[in-house]
Amino acid sequence: MSVKGVEMPEMTWDLDVGNKWRRRKVLSRIHRFWECRLRVWWLSDAGVRETDPPRPRRRPTWMTAVFHVICAVLLTLMIMAIGALIAYLRYYHQDSWRDMLHDLFCGCHYPEKCRRHHERQRSRRRAMDVPDPELGDPARRPLNGAMYYGSGCRFDTVEMVDETRPAPPALSSPETGDDSNDDAVAGGGAGGVTSSATRTTSSNALLPEWMDAVHVAVQAAVQATVQVSGPRENAVSPAT
């Protein structure tokens, strides 16, 4: 077959009937997308057999059994640990999570005393606008931030005492005749170190015994250093 002298191939029936390739339905993009999703999600049985033929099922080996046992044991231990932690917190720290954190990280051996201490702190924070003789002048309260926002741990700082100055007079009440500070005045340096260490550590009722001993030793060493390095009254000046 030739058209105007140009040889044309013999047209088949499919191409001859209205050019079938021009009459195919052109789907929109969203239509093609959803058609693809439906074909993936809801394949017919024939489609499943064609795309994914049945494979022989793998038999579980002893490694698989060991892995399953280990996973089951770990899961059981984790659940038991969480249950034990919840039971511990509910039994010992049912009132306050803050007290629980304080007891865990500050070494508190008397939770009731600590709880009352925190309750007093909270009540003082609520009543910051009310004058309190224990807190001092309300206008100067922001300067006492450690009293309100401290951690509550009873670790007192080391008290620096200048042994070169004369000791304050003893505070003795005429009714009881309590002259507990007279030995510190008459004893001089060593007596002052012992009495001040005892006085400081007596307020540390929440610390264990070994911490009290460490505290006393540190205070004695610091005060001995201050006493040695401080100016002496009878020392001769090198200028003279």
Curated annotation (Swiss-Prot):
It comes from the Viruses. The keyword Amino-acid biosynthesis does not apply. It is found in: Host membrane. Keywords: Host membrane, Host-virus interaction, Membrane, Transmembrane, Transmembrane helix. It is a single-pass membrane protein. Its main location: host cell. Belongs to the HHV-5 UL136 protein family. Interacts with host ATP1B1. This is Protein UL136. The lineage of its organism: Viruses, Duplodnaviria, Heunggongvirae, Peploviricota, Herviviricetes. The gene is UL136.
